[in-house]
Amino acid sequence: MSHTSFLFRIWFLMVTISLGRGQAAPLPTVQAAQKADTITLSNTAISATWSIRAGTLQWQSLTNHFTGTTLPLAGTVFELVPREGPVLRSSGFKMVTAPIIEDAPVSRDSSKAANHLPGRQVRVELEDTSAKLRITWQAILREGANYIRQEVTIRALQPSLALSQIVLIDAVVPGAAVAGHAKGSPVTAGTWFLALEHPLSECRVHADRVSCWLPRELPLQAGQSVTYSSVIGATRATQLRRDFLNYVEHERAHPYRTFLHYNSWYDLGFFDRYNEQDAVAVVQSFGEQLTKLRAVKLDSFLFDDGWDDPTTLWKFNPGFADGLTKVAQAAVSYGAAPGIWLSPWGGYDKPKQQRLASARAQGFETNEGGLALSGPKYYRYFRDTCLDLIEKYGVNQFKFDGTGNANEVIKGSEFDSDFDAAIHLIGELRARKPDLYVNLTTGTYPSPFWLLYADSIWRGGDDHSFAGVGSNRQRWITYRDSQIYRWVVEEGPLFPMNSLMLHGLIFARYAERLGSDPGHDFPDEVHSYFGTGTQLQEMYITPSLLSADDWDVLAEAAKWSRANAQTLKDSHWIGGDPARLEVYGWASWSPEKAIVTLRNPSDQRQDFTASLAALLELPEGSARVYAARSPWKSDGAAQALQIPAQEQHIFHLRPFQVLTLELVPSS
């Protein structure tokens, strides 16, 4: 068995346990059957039935086996909206062949967890002769899944077809509401969730009628095919967020993983060029302090803006005569690899203008935002640059900073937009290196469906700033977390906290007001940061500025985070708005352990009252009492506290206190 397959088996076991009622659940066995004029897919979590009466395909019903509730979905399975002419509904397409029921394909080499799991799928070929369209529809259900995915592949048989929208959900769903304000937000209804699986999708609910569609700009050319997908999932009572997260962890490009790394921004460069000697030195400093002296696993060293010569467009500056060869060798010696910042639209400020001038001289496409990734020539160049970095230097992560337009079509492009091009680019890179880490930053927003392609997205706001009261570092922490609340908690409540770029830990020479720590607040920043559960763990740190105690605090928290990854991946927001100086934090739960991190952003003492059942969103059958204690050595003298899960508990917080509690079931 390969190492990758072993890790995915461990992941699958953990998912199965977490979907239980506080205990291990039996593995769902997927059943698929055709009986008379109906097709059914089912496991112990969910069942779906479609009608194929009179040779047409239509929804019939869905059943949630956790709650025993049924959702009648009589109606169309999809709708295609042409720019001219009538809407083409699934009811107007005729089956070309009998339905095919088969095993879902399994790929042990895939980076997507779902592709490692067995399952069943139903496939139907449909045709509309008047519109000269062929549709391949399939529904897929896998082991361990609490959701059913539908894929619709459209193939034009005539010269071209100009479509304005692809509608994959159009049904009456009582109690439905869009869960968020960002594009690509799912719809929820009681213990159900529904969505079109794309970050550019849009959903609307009016009088319980749910419609989810994806705009399309380019015409579909004769012989060309394109695939879109939707999902409908069942959840347990009170467990919608957690069971939606189970879906995300199955289907995301790569399951959650701790990814600890250095970032050169604010340290080596701040719009300045740096060189190989600088880069190797910082790798050695972090490697010695964290890996050799403190046994911390480092994953990567990310070299941000400053490694390239902006007058040549994504070529190394003269200070890197051998590219990343020596940097990669140094990183590998500490068990890590190099990572690279690239900006599809060209970056920022003066270097961006230099890159644009170079691009235009070489005939690359541009648009209002800068370089146009969707341009045919620039796309090929940018893709080949990325692949070259992977092949030559073993680059294991890309920070893609800025993706340009979301709705402009470049002449000659095969993509609807720069965002569409970025999605295809990431797919090509993952095909070459499945475990590649991709951080997609500026231009993103909290749609969970970015995670079908990228590993993490930007939290929103400025890189760093200051809010609230207290020292500069305390005000930076408040600002960081106020942006999470504003742009993610309020705009996209089902986006996983575990997949945000928060702009890391900052203690660096070029970081405004964060190049020193006179108030000794660095431990608060470290403990709050790792308490978020984010997998993208960035260190914007100048090594020489840290004391031995600072390194110790950082190492302890980093190791704690990795050791508790299976719990922290459940991280969700608790409490109020940091900008209002309200107590807030994060909580996460697994059957073996729970973690609560609370922060008081005020210079006054504050109490926070809540039950563990509410904070942890405990499923039925969970422990009734938890033993709570801090994991930090500095709190080692404190005794464990027994907290009944269902009772209101008062947490007393000192000014600016960050309280971390590990909670172990004691009954």
Model-derived regions, located:
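Acidic, contiguous internal or C-terminal segments within carbohydrate-active enzymes
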Residues: 33, 52, 115-173, 589-592
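Acidic-aromatic substrate-binding/catalytic surfaces of carbohydrate-active enzymes
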Residues: 36-125
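Short Pro-Gly-centered flexible turn/kink motifs
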Residues: 45, 216-236, 651-664
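Active-site-proximal substrate-binding groove within the catalytic cores of carbohydrate-active enzymes
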Residues: 62, 223, 422-635, 650-660, ...
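Glycine-rich, aromatic-flanked loop segments that form ligand/cofactor-binding clefts
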Residues: 239, 244, 260, 302-303, ...
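An acidic-aromatic substrate-binding cleft motif
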Residues: 240-300, 304-308
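The substrate-binding groove and active-site-proximal loops of carbohydrate-active enzymes
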Residues: 261-280, 307-322, 364-381, 404-419, ...
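Active-site-adjacent "subsite" loops/lids of carbohydrate-active enzymes
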Residues: 268-273, 337-393, 404
